[in-house]
Amino acid sequence: MKVVIFDMDGTVIDSGEAIYKTVNEVRDELSLAPLDKEFIIKAINEPGRNLALEFYGIDTPSKSLKEGFEEKFKKFYDECATTYDGVKELLQKCKEAKFKIVLASNAPHDTLEKILKKNEIYELFDEVIGASKEIPQKPDPAMLHLAVSKTGASKAIFVGDSLKDELSAKNANMPYVQVCWGFGEESKTAAYNVKNVSEAWEIILNF
């Protein structure tokens, strides 16, 4: 049995506008000029960057700043986050092919169901896995290992858009597909790069 594991933001869900608006609303409150959307998106997808320092000039953000960010992000995420074109159809094809489908996101586990249901794709996933105290964020491979164990699959492939995703797949010794329709750029080290869902489907079908 095959399992196809999908990252969420930048792969299934386009949350770029929500992230962009949140960062710049916080910056506005700190009397800072807005940042370019492309810079913000690239920064959040690269491991090891001090985002508080780069976005707000603060080395260690206060609890109130963190809470303010989370509150604003939830608001904008609910307003702006949508599925990328063709992704729902891709998930349906996986379902019709009798593949198991799992979502593995660095977002907190308790926030995932709402956005997936809003975009009418929640029921297409066999398992939904988010970060929690017990499950570390990618690039740790724990989520991918959990996806395999929960579905009992003998073969697995991970579809994502960032270096964190690619490293997570590498750490799990799993084939990886880098999508370039969202936040992601072509990876020189990924086994597969895809520009659209048709290309993604060909790889998923034949791995």
Q: Language-model features: where?
A:
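Surface-exposed amphipathic alpha-helices with a cationic face
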Residues: 88-96, 148, 166-170
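Short acidic-hydrophobic, aromatic-tinged amphipathic segments that line or gate anion-handling sites
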Residues: 192-200
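Glycine-rich phosphate-binding loop signature in dinucleotide/nucleotide-binding domains
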Residues: 96-99, 150-154, 207
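N-terminal helical cap/lid subdomain that shapes the substrate entry/recognition surface
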Residues: 2-89
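Short, acidic loop-to-helix structural element flanking the phosphoryl-transfer center
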Residues: 75-103, 109, 113, 138-141
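Conserved Lys-Pro-Asp/Glu-containing loop-to-beta segment of HAD-superfamily phosphomonoesterases
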Residues: 3, 137-166
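A short, structured active-site edge motif that brings together acidic residues
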Residues: 40, 122-137
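Acidic, Mg2+-coordinating phosphoryl-transfer loop and its flanking beta/alpha structural elements
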Residues: 157-192
